[in-house]
Amino acid sequence: MFSFFKKKIVVPHVRLTGVIGTAGRFKQGMDLAGQRTILKKAFSFKKIKHVAISINSPGGSPVQSHLIYSYIKQLAKEKKVKVIIFAEDVAASGGYLISCAGDEIYANSSSIIGSIGVISASFGFKDLIKKIGIERRVYTAGKNKSTLDPFVDEKEEDVKRLKNIQLELHADFIKVVEASRGSKLKDPEKNNIFTGEFW
Protein backbone atom coordinates (compact mmCIF):
# COMPACT_ATOMS: atom_id res chain seq x y z
CA MET A 1 0.00 0.00 0.00
CA PHE A 2 1.40 3.37 -1.02
CA SER A 3 1.14 6.58 0.94
CA PHE A 4 0.34 9.71 -1.02
CA PHE A 5 1.00 11.97 1.94
CA LYS A 6 4.45 13.44 2.21
CA LYS A 7 5.87 14.08 5.62
CA LYS A 8 6.15 17.73 6.50
CA ILE A 9 9.66 19.04 6.87
CA VAL A 10 9.92 20.91 10.15
CA VAL A 11 12.49 23.69 10.54
CA PRO A 12 12.20 25.47 13.90
CA HIS A 13 12.84 29.22 13.67
CA VAL A 14 14.14 31.61 16.33
CA ARG A 15 14.46 35.41 16.08
CA LEU A 16 17.24 37.11 18.03
CA THR A 17 16.84 40.88 17.99
CA GLY A 18 18.10 43.95 19.79
CA VAL A 19 21.18 45.21 21.57
CA ILE A 20 23.10 42.41 23.27
CA GLY A 21 23.40 42.65 27.03
CA THR A 22 21.28 43.46 30.06
CA ALA A 23 19.82 46.83 29.07
CA GLY A 24 18.05 47.75 32.31
CA ARG A 25 14.79 47.53 34.20
CA PHE A 26 12.57 49.22 31.61
CA LYS A 27 14.48 48.34 28.45
CA GLN A 28 14.87 44.82 27.16
CA GLY A 29 18.27 43.59 26.02
CA MET A 30 19.35 40.30 24.49
CA ASP A 31 21.26 37.97 26.81
CA LEU A 32 21.60 34.22 27.24
CA ALA A 33 19.27 34.13 30.24
CA GLY A 34 16.49 35.60 28.11
CA GLN A 35 17.13 33.42 25.05
CA ARG A 36 18.05 30.07 26.61
CA THR A 37 14.51 28.66 26.81
CA ILE A 38 13.46 29.51 23.26
CA LEU A 39 16.76 28.22 21.82
CA LYS A 40 16.49 24.99 23.79
CA LYS A 41 12.91 24.51 22.60
CA ALA A 42 13.89 25.04 18.96
CA PHE A 43 16.48 22.27 19.15
CA SER A 44 14.16 19.91 21.07
CA PHE A 45 11.95 18.98 18.09
CA LYS A 46 12.35 15.36 17.05
CA LYS A 47 13.84 14.31 13.72
CA ILE A 48 14.81 17.80 12.61
CA LYS A 49 17.85 18.42 10.46
CA HIS A 50 18.05 22.19 10.62
CA VAL A 51 17.27 25.10 12.94
CA ALA A 52 16.87 28.56 11.40
CA ILE A 53 17.90 31.64 13.37
CA SER A 54 17.21 35.20 12.24
CA ILE A 55 19.50 37.84 13.71
CA ASN A 56 18.87 41.57 13.83
CA SER A 57 21.42 43.09 16.19
CA PRO A 58 24.12 45.78 16.09
CA GLY A 59 26.02 43.99 18.86
CA GLY A 60 26.67 44.90 22.47
CA SER A 61 28.17 42.90 25.33
CA PRO A 62 31.04 40.67 24.16
CA VAL A 63 30.36 38.30 27.06
CA GLN A 64 26.67 37.76 26.27
CA SER A 65 27.46 37.54 22.54
CA HIS A 66 29.92 34.72 23.18
CA LEU A 67 27.60 32.97 25.65
CA ILE A 68 24.74 32.90 23.11
CA TYR A 69 27.13 31.80 20.34
CA SER A 70 28.52 28.98 22.51
CA TYR A 71 25.07 27.80 23.59
CA ILE A 72 23.86 27.54 19.99
CA LYS A 73 27.01 25.58 19.07
CA GLN A 74 26.49 23.30 22.07
CA LEU A 75 22.86 22.53 21.18
CA ALA A 76 23.71 21.94 17.52
CA LYS A 77 26.43 19.47 18.48
CA GLU A 78 24.26 17.62 21.01
CA LYS A 79 21.30 17.29 18.63
CA LYS A 80 23.41 16.79 15.48
CA VAL A 81 21.51 19.61 13.77
CA LYS A 82 22.74 22.19 11.27
CA VAL A 83 22.14 25.87 12.00
CA ILE A 84 21.14 28.28 9.24
CA ILE A 85 21.56 31.98 10.05
CA PHE A 86 19.59 34.75 8.35
CA ALA A 87 20.88 38.29 8.85
CA GLU A 88 18.09 40.86 8.75
CA ASP A 89 18.76 44.64 8.88
CA VAL A 90 22.00 44.26 10.79
CA ALA A 91 24.24 41.49 12.11
CA ALA A 92 27.24 43.47 13.24
CA SER A 93 29.85 43.19 15.98
CA GLY A 94 28.35 40.86 18.63
CA GLY A 95 25.44 40.18 16.28
CA TYR A 96 27.90 38.85 13.73
CA LEU A 97 29.72 36.83 16.40
CA ILE A 98 26.44 35.04 17.17
CA SER A 99 25.94 34.50 13.43
CA CYS A 100 29.19 32.55 13.40
CA ALA A 101 27.37 29.75 15.26
CA GLY A 102 25.69 28.94 11.95
CA ASP A 103 26.82 26.38 9.39
CA GLU A 104 25.55 28.78 6.75
CA ILE A 105 24.88 32.54 6.85
CA TYR A 106 22.50 34.31 4.48
CA ALA A 107 22.11 38.08 4.27
CA ASN A 108 20.05 40.53 2.26
CA SER A 109 22.03 42.70 -0.14
CA SER A 110 21.14 45.68 2.07
CA SER A 111 21.99 44.03 5.41
CA ILE A 112 24.78 45.60 7.46
CA ILE A 113 27.37 42.92 8.22
CA GLY A 114 30.74 42.83 9.95
CA SER A 115 32.18 45.35 12.43
CA ILE A 116 34.60 42.73 13.77
CA GLY A 117 36.28 44.83 16.42
CA VAL A 118 36.03 46.17 19.96
CA ILE A 119 35.04 49.65 21.10
CA SER A 120 34.95 51.47 24.43
CA ALA A 121 33.68 55.02 24.87
CA SER A 122 33.59 57.56 27.66
CA PHE A 123 33.54 61.29 28.39
CA GLY A 124 35.82 63.62 30.31
CA PHE A 125 34.11 65.98 32.77
CA LYS A 126 37.11 67.41 34.63
CA ASP A 127 36.85 70.97 33.28
CA LEU A 128 33.05 70.98 33.48
CA ILE A 129 32.78 70.21 37.19
CA LYS A 130 35.54 72.70 37.93
CA LYS A 131 33.69 75.38 35.99
CA ILE A 132 30.44 74.90 37.89
CA GLY A 133 32.19 74.74 41.25
CA ILE A 134 31.86 71.06 42.10
CA GLU A 135 34.60 69.35 44.08
CA ARG A 136 34.66 65.57 43.67
CA ARG A 137 35.99 63.37 46.46
CA VAL A 138 36.85 59.72 45.83
CA TYR A 139 38.29 57.27 48.35
CA THR A 140 39.58 53.88 47.23
CA ALA A 141 41.40 50.84 48.56
CA GLY A 142 43.58 49.65 45.71
CA LYS A 143 45.51 52.07 43.52
CA ASN A 144 43.73 50.98 40.31
CA LYS A 145 40.19 51.07 41.67
CA SER A 146 39.46 54.42 40.00
CA THR A 147 40.93 53.52 36.62
CA LEU A 148 39.70 55.79 33.78
CA ASP A 149 37.81 58.09 36.13
CA PRO A 150 36.03 60.57 33.80
CA PHE A 151 36.46 63.42 36.30
CA VAL A 152 40.28 63.47 36.25
CA ASP A 153 42.96 63.53 33.56
CA GLU A 154 43.51 60.25 31.76
CA LYS A 155 46.55 58.28 32.85
CA GLU A 156 48.68 56.75 30.11
CA GLU A 157 48.95 53.43 31.96
CA ASP A 158 45.14 53.24 32.30
CA VAL A 159 44.61 53.76 28.58
CA LYS A 160 47.31 51.20 27.80
CA ARG A 161 45.65 48.62 30.06
CA LEU A 162 42.27 49.20 28.41
CA LYS A 163 43.87 48.83 25.00
CA ASN A 164 45.39 45.48 26.00
CA ILE A 165 41.98 44.23 27.13
CA GLN A 166 40.47 45.36 23.82
CA LEU A 167 43.20 43.55 21.88
CA GLU A 168 42.51 40.32 23.79
CA LEU A 169 38.78 40.56 23.09
CA HIS A 170 39.46 41.33 19.43
CA ALA A 171 41.79 38.33 19.13
CA ASP A 172 39.08 36.06 20.59
CA PHE A 173 36.54 37.50 18.13
CA ILE A 174 38.88 36.84 15.21
CA LYS A 175 39.41 33.23 16.33
CA VAL A 176 35.65 32.63 16.35
CA VAL A 177 35.25 34.08 12.85
CA GLU A 178 38.20 32.13 11.45
CA ALA A 179 36.96 28.87 12.99
CA SER A 180 33.44 29.43 11.69
CA ARG A 181 33.98 30.88 8.23
CA GLY A 182 37.27 29.14 7.40
CA SER A 183 37.92 28.95 3.67
CA LYS A 184 35.10 31.42 2.98
CA LEU A 185 37.37 34.23 4.16
CA LYS A 186 39.20 35.84 1.27
CA ASP A 187 42.51 37.37 2.36
CA PRO A 188 41.22 38.94 5.63
CA GLU A 189 44.12 41.40 6.00
CA LYS A 190 43.85 42.68 2.45
CA ASN A 191 40.07 43.03 2.60
CA ASN A 192 39.93 44.78 6.00
CA ILE A 193 37.70 42.03 7.42
CA PHE A 194 39.08 42.30 10.96
CA THR A 195 39.50 46.09 11.15
CA GLY A 196 36.03 46.85 12.52
CA GLU A 197 34.77 47.86 9.09
CA PHE A 198 31.21 46.93 8.13
CA TRP A 199 29.49 46.34 4.81
In which residue ranges do the predicted regions lie?
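Small-residue-centered hinge/linker elements
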Residues: 1-81, 90-97, 101-183
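Secondary-structure end/capping motifs
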Residues: 173-199
